[in-house]
Amino acid sequence: MSCELVTTGWFASDQPRNYRTAGDDAIRGVGFRPVWWQSVDTFLAPRHVLVVDSASPVKAKESEFTATPVERIELLMNPGHSQNGTTHYCGAMAAIMLSMEYALFNDVDLFLYVEQDALIHGKAILDRTKNALRRRDLVFGRGDMDIQQSFFAANKKGLRRFLSALHSINYSDKQIAPEY
């Protein structure tokens, strides 16, 4: 079983970070990309992938790792991390929101977002996600963190509702970080 579209964000830099992160920086760089693609191609088998690039100084050459068609949208500037961003939305939220709109404009029935540092595993993950979306409009992963946005899915109704709610938040991501 395959899906029509997987979306993700992208930012990589050789410079030290000026914000707090969890995990090894190796998962945020080009060196991790072949592993990411192997998990996405093996367990989701998308017909298309959208990468929203936050004006990253280091680019991944996606075609070196996959035969899946990739569309890339590059932001004019890096919105930054929620801890130090200067715009209303941080880079992660820009990637999520732009890819949601992209999915709606392309009439995609199943929206899947996989963060650039997340691995997907399990032959039944796509079927289980589709089944869950028959009961709910949004499906998020499970784990130790309060918020699980590394992998999530939505149907069209869920996309419209979620985008509407996100756009109604008057506080910037720096004021109220989306991770918390």
Model segments located where?
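Conserved donor NDP-sugar-binding/catalytic core segment of glycosyltransferases
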Residues: 106, 130-141, 145
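Acidic donor-binding/catalytic loop of UDP-sugar-dependent glycosyltransferases
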Residues: 116-130
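Short loop->beta transition adjacent to catalytic acidic/histidine clusters or analogous donor-positioning motifs
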Residues: 3, 41-50, 70
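Short, solvent-exposed loop/turn segments at secondary-structure junctions
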Residues: 11-15, 55-58, 78-81, 116-120, ...
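N-proximal low-complexity "stem/linker" segments adjacent to membrane-targeting elements
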Residues: 1-35
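Short beta-strand-to-loop acidic/aromatic patch adjacent to the donor-nucleotide binding site
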Residues: 107-119
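Catalytic core and acceptor-binding pocket of nucleotide-sugar-dependent glycosyltransferases
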Residues: 120-123, 141-145, 149-180
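Active-site-proximal specificity loops/subdomain of glycosyltransferases
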Residues: 16-22, 52-106
